[in-house]
């Protein structure tokens, strides 16, 4: 399991790496292998610095790829973090699922 952090200075998109780099860098040696990680948006509560994940080459995205900046209010639903799973489809393709 890994942790990725980003401290944006405004709303913006963040592209994933390429599928080939995920396959080699995360040692996804067989189809179906996977890797889970948490993405934490470090944007300040009052600044609404949201991140939208976009797909790099060979990456298919499934689920909501919008990660809101954290909201520290008591009844808040925006934690500022998201959990993802990268799953190998082939040597040159992965699917990234938002799982939480």
What are these language model-derived features?
Residues 1-66, 74-76, 88-100:
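Exposed extracellular interaction/assembly regions and N-terminal maturation sites
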Residues 81-86:
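Short tryptophan-centered beta-strand motifs in secreted/extracellular beta-sheet-rich domains
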């Amino acid at each position: 399991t890994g942790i990725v952090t980003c401290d944006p200075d405004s709303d913006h998109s963040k592209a994933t790496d390429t599928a080939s780099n995920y396959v080699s860098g995360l040692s996804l040696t067989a189809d179906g292998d996977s890797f889970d990680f948490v993405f934490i948006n470090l944007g300040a509560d009052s600044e609404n610095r949201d991140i939208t994940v976009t797909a790099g080459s060979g990456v298919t995205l499934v689920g909501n790829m919008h990660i809101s900046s954290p909201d520290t209010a008591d009844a808040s639903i925006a934690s500022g973090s998201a959990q993802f799973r990268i799953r190998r489809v082939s040597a040159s393709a992965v699917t990234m699922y938002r799982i939480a």
